Amino acid sequence: MFKKHTISLLIIFLLASAVLAKPIEAHTVSPVNPNAQQTTKTVMNWLAHLPNRTENRVLSGAFGGYSHDTFSMAEADRIRSATGQSPAIYGCDYARGWLETANIEDSIDVSCNGDLMSYWKNGGIPQISLHLANPAFQSGHFKTPITNDQYKKILDSSTVEGKRLNAMLSKIADGLQELENQGVPVLFRPLHEMNGEWFWWGLTSYNQKDNERISLYKQLYKKIYHYMTDTRGLDHLIWVYSPDANRDFKTDFYPGASYVDIVGLDAYFQDAYSINGYDQLTALNKPFAFTEVGPQTANGSFDYSLFINAIKQKYPKTIYFLAWNDEWSAAVNKGASALYHDSWTLNKGEIWNGDSLTPIVE
């Protein structure tokens, strides 16, 4: 009897050991586009796992300017001169929505693509944003408010306004296609700061909720998503939703989990420990980033070392930040070296290990 009992215990022990020894199944985070290119899938999954690391877990980022007008590698060069490091993410804006042009699509420029391709091939990740011209006008007017009736016309492809929007989207898609052809994944951030009252696609009054406007915004976002994804077949985009931290209704405009890969905040602040919206955005269960950041008072006195410390203490799910250029740049403020050399910060050249991304931590 004792012998049988011992054998039974031994069998149970061996079975339990086998179960415990079985490798834990990896948790994969996929892009919302089911047809995403394999490289884009790999990058998305890698980004989503960054918060599991103990260090090298927050990608640095910087805005390089507006394509054709101000875009160059100068911002990356300034940061490298100040810190000895280069930003992991480098941003370009295709849309110069303030320009008065004969045709609204002429405000779109994609000439930054060459530099973005090189940045990717040399170990960085490109980000593209859009300060779109206002289709309610012939061109320009990206900060001119529109009524909800005008908004509806923009959504209607049969109207003059709708055709203007489509002309811009077509040219943007052409530029994105160039990057896809080279296998370059893109952090794509359209229609940002929609909860603010300064861009035509957003609210019209300070912190005044407009449910119809919110619905129209969601329709516009989805229209752009379906055009890029279904009509144009662009499978290299990682879709980023980025409301403004200093306004209410941060998640009201959220178009849905099927349309967004990363959520973030555009945050201009004096106190890095008092940024609003982190809990609201992370509750959407998407990877979180500071999609645009800078000091509220841009006089060179801001200390960016406080920002990375705040990320570590208050916003630990952050996977990247993208600091604006010019007077908001880390290079012309304090603490740039501390920001770029912090143990949590991941810079260009630290993303890849040979031909593979650095290992994922489950």
UniProtKB/Swiss-Prot annotation:
GO terms for molecular function: mannan endo-1,4-beta-mannosidase activity. Residues 1-26 form the signal peptide. Induction: Up-regulated by konjac glucomannan and by cellobiose and mannobiose, the possible degradation products of glucomannan. Repressed by glucose via the carbon catabolite repression system. Also repressed by GmuR. It catalyses: Random hydrolysis of (1->4)-beta-D-mannosidic linkages in mannans, galactomannans and glucomannans. This is Mannan endo-1,4-beta-mannosidase. Belongs to the glycosyl hydrolase 26 family. The lineage of its organism: Bacteria, Bacillati, Bacillota, Bacilli, Bacillales. GO terms for cellular component: extracellular region. One of its GO terms (biological process) is substituted mannan metabolic process. Keywords: Carbohydrate metabolism, Glycosidase, Hydrolase, Polysaccharide degradation, Secreted, Signal. Involved in the degradation of glucomannan. Catalyzes the endo hydrolysis of beta-1,4-linked mannan, galactomannan and glucomannan. Homodimer.
